[in-house]
Amino acid sequence: MNNKKFQVNFNNIPKLPKGSFGGGFGLLALGGVGLLALSSLVNVEGGHRAIVFNRFVGIKNKVYNEGTHFIVPWFERAEIYDVRAKPRSISSLTGSKDLQMVNITIRVLSKPKVSQLPAIYRTLGKDYDERVLPSIVNEILKSIVAQFNASQLITQREQVSRLIFKRLVDRAKDFNIELDDVSITHLNFGREYAAAIEAKQVAQQEAERARFLVEKALQDKRSIIVKAEGEAQSAQLINDAIKQSPYLVQLRTLEASKEIAHILSKSPNKLYISNETLLLNGFDLNNNQQPKK
C-alpha cells in the first residue's frame, strides 16, 4: 500500500465576518446590563411597605414606603409586607366561672406596626400573625371568660368584648402588632347548659302566661262588679224617677212605639197595627191620661 499523507487545506474553511464576535459580545453585555438594572428596582404597591436585607449588614432599619426604590443587586434583597388591616377569626374552647364549657369565636382586625417592620422580620418573619395571634387570643379568652358566669357572658356581651379588646391590644403591643377591632361573633355553650336555658325559658313563659291569666280574671271580675253596680244604680235611678214622675213610663213607651213604627215603615209590605201592638193601649194620647190599671 502506498502511504499517502493527509493534508488539510485551511483555505477552504469559511472565514467569520469581521466584527461578528464583538457584536455578539456587545449584545450579551447589553442584556446583562438591562437585567442588572431591572433587578436593582423594587416596586412597593399601595398598602405595602418594604424592608431590605443586605448580605453584609443584615436587615436594614429603614422602611421603604410606596413607590419604586433602588437596591444593589445580589447584595440586597427586598421583603414586602402588607400593612393593611386584615380580619381573622379565632375560636377557643374554655370554661366559665360556673364551670360551663364555652365555645367562643372572635374576629380580630390586625396589622403590623410599620415603624417596627425590621424588628418583626428579625423575630417573627413574614407570617407574624400566624405565629402570634392564635396563642395570645387563646390566652386572653381563657383568662377573661373565667371571670364571668355563662349567663353573664350573654347579658354582658358588650362589656366582655370591650375587656377582651383592651387586653388583646396591650398584649399585641409586645409583638409590634396593632389591633383595630375585636368583636365576639359566636358564643356557644354545652348541650346540658343549652337544655337548661331552654327549660328555664319555657318555665318563664309558662309563668308569664299564668300571671296574664290571673290578671285577666281579676280584670273580668272587676268589670262584672262595676257593670252590676252600674245596673243597680241605673235601676235605682229609674225607680226614683218613676216615683217622682209617673209620666216617665209613658215617655219610654212612646219612644219604643216610635222605634217600632220606624222599623215597620221600611218594610215593603203594608201592615195594619193596632194600638196594642204599638204599646199605645196603656194611655189616652189626646187627653194625656195616666196609664190604665
Curated annotation (Swiss-Prot):
It is found in: Mitochondrion inner membrane; Cytoplasm; Nucleus; Cell membrane. Keywords: Cell membrane, Coiled coil, Cytoplasm, Membrane, Mitochondrion, Mitochondrion inner membrane, Nucleus, Signal-anchor, Transmembrane, Transmembrane helix. It is a single-pass type II membrane protein. It comes from the Eukaryota. One of its GO terms (biological process) is mitophagy. Gene3D superfamilies: Band 7 domain. Its main location: mitochondrion. The chain crosses the membrane at residues 21-41. CDD domains: SPFH_prohibitin. One of its GO terms (cellular component) is mitochondrial prohibitin complex. Residues 190-235 form a coiled coil. InterPro entries: Band_7, Band_7/SPFH_dom_sf, Prohibitin. Pfam families: Band_7. Belongs to the prohibitin family. The mitochondrial prohibitin complex consists of two subunits (PHB1 and PHB2), assembled into a membrane-associated ring-shaped supercomplex of approximately 1 mDa. Protein with pleiotropic attributes mediated in a cell-compartment- and tissue-specific manner, which include the plasma membrane-associated cell signaling functions, mitochondrial chaperone, and transcriptional co-regulator of transcription factors and sex steroid hormones in the nucleus. In the mitochondria, together with PHB, forms large ring complexes (prohibitin complexes) in the inner mitochondrial membrane (IMM) and functions as a chaperone protein that stabilizes mitochondrial respiratory enzymes and maintains mitochondrial integrity in the IMM, which is required for mitochondrial morphogenesis, neuronal survival, and normal lifespan. This is Prohibitin-2. It comes from Dictyostelium discoideum.
